[in-house]
């Protein structure tokens, strides 16, 4: 908004939030100018100007702003308590806006900045926090001050930018205090469930402590006390910028948080009363809770804009040049980290959409699943070659071959075939009478498919082949450890892995001992029926297995399927050396040789090793855990078939890491908990030292750092009632 048109805008209740000092860094060009007060505040109406002059809004008998005086929150797209209609047009704005007011879409920080804030210079944008005192923003003296600033020397311009950074940081810390110590504390004291509080405010306490106890004191000391002798900003920002990656967790949770606020405001009178009572206070500036929750989403991009402006005015030979450039790089990385978190949420939303389109036929909503490509395709009939309309969903672990349903609402596709990526092959074919065809070959079925164009066919082939290759690389991570934890897996997954019951041959003991260290010789099985029957009953006693009282085990020498009673012959202090009666009598058991110990990882890892896994804290299973160096934000878990969902991949940035309360009395010691949305996993290490090592590595990886460049892991979440470490 032009400075001349907004000269009569009073501080009003908005200035009470920030309470900034007047001075060169107190401008608020971005958001305050988009807050029209009164129905004709910007039209030069004498009545509205007189009302704006005394700064006292029209207050109704209930303490709410009257209907004739609406203050829309034009920055966030979320109306204030007094606004009755979202995106309502006000008088004298028809000529300024071509449509309804734009709204912010949840966690999209860039969209919020681009669509809501007027196009201003980076320096003005960095100082556009709502709630700052509009002391001289639109006065005639503003033009004189800008003209005088243009004549200032380079060092004075840098000082002005530094003062703007300090001023906006002070205001921002007050916002964080309002969210953390006012809203969050009052709602907690009112008895709102802790999971709702955590869902709304996420890690706002950590963000508040970082800015209030570290970044703001450093900036204040440097700019107000040391600037004459040490005029630098880059070294401070470079040291603390990596911690800005914690914004990724807050940003990805923003959509859910806003939804929780709306839901609980509608359904809980207590929640509504507490929130509205705070919003009426002067410290809140008559702005909604949702508006204040938006501030952290927009903060990191503003650091980036301000630092770019600082670098433009910084001489090339300045001592702070190198540190400032490195700081900009780190802050840009933090912004990208937030954007990556947003993309993860969008991927999960896409999985939910596909799940609804399939009518819930396949359980695809899993943090390890990723939808890579989907599209309409034609399947050529095996009988007469007639093309039939089909739909393909390509995930990172499977392909869903679906048939369209002629419905306007509800389920749109029915799953005809599910093909695992493991063992899948794709091949381009050339047929004289049919163009643009290729074949997908799985373990159970082959599909001859046709696309509309040659480019579309090449795209499908390339992306399917790339998905297969990536899946193979991930599987290689655990190939060296498969023998130690394999239970009953598909033989085609690893045809030449160490001896297990899944091999297409049944190993038996030989007297010469010429086959390997254990003296084993493969013997062909008679039929698939026999193999299936042997897997269902114990080799020694013949009793049928079940998941409760008769669990299956495998002999570590011959690989036979046996029950626990018939596999009590094991080496001392070696739970992994279960063997059957025959092997115990014929072969000496050496734990060092029979228990496979992983010695080398084909792909280097930040940390790997055996752990125990449980989803309920009661039943535990052995797994091999690894955080690969190539993808340090993912935890891979490899285990046996008794846990049907293993192996699995857990995205660490989407998880919450915590140490269980001692009162839970879990069956295993040295336990920690990983939680994603409504799913949780308990992991247990063999020692306290190993537990601490995993906690540090997981905490560091969850915030986007690696072991080499991490400035230190962030504090873990401490369960309520437990003392902080």
From Swiss-Prot:
Q: Where is the PH domain?
A: 370-469, 604-703
Q: Which residues carry this modification: Phosphoserine?
A: 128
Q: Spell out the subcellular localization from the entry.
A: Cytoplasm; Cytoplasm, Cytoskeleton
Tell me the residue numbers annotated for binding Zn(2+) 1.
Answer: 538, 541, 563, 566
Task: List, as start-end ranges, the regions of compositional bias called Low complexity.
Answer: 500-512
Disordered: annotated segments: 1-151, 487-532, 703-725
Q: Where are the zinc fingers (FYVE-type)?
A: 532-588
Location of the DH domain:
157-341
The GO biological-process annotations, alphabetized, read as: actin cytoskeleton organization; cytoskeleton organization; filopodium assembly; regulation of cell shape; regulation of GTPase activity; regulation of small GTPase mediated signal transduction
Q: Which residues cross the membrane?
A: none
Q: Where is the composition biased (Basic and acidic residues)?
A: 521-532
Which amino acids does the record list as binding Zn(2+) 2?
555, 558, 580, 583
Thylakoid in keyword set: no
MF terms in GO: guanyl-nucleotide exchange factor activity; small GTPase binding; zinc ion binding
One cellular component term (GO) for this entry is: cytosol
Q: Which UniProt keywords apply?
A: Cytoplasm, Cytoskeleton, Guanine-nucleotide releasing factor, Metal-binding, Phosphoprotein, Repeat, Zinc, Zinc-finger
| Matching Pfam families | FYVE, PH, RhoGEF
Ranges annotated as biased composition (Acidic residues): 124-136
| PANTHER family cross-referenced by the UniProt entry | FACIOGENITAL DYSPLASIA PROTEIN (PTHR12673), FYVE, RHOGEF AND PH DOMAIN-CONTAINING PROTEIN 3 (PTHR12673:SF14)
Q: What does this protein do?
A: Promotes the formation of filopodia. May activate CDC42, a member of the Ras-like family of Rho- and Rac proteins, by exchanging bound GDP for free GTP. Plays a role in regulating the actin cytoskeleton and cell shape.
Put simply, this protein is called FYVE, RhoGEF and PH domain-containing protein 3
Query: What is the organism of origin for this protein?
Result: Homo sapiens
Organism classification: Eukaryota, Metazoa, Chordata, Craniata, Vertebrata
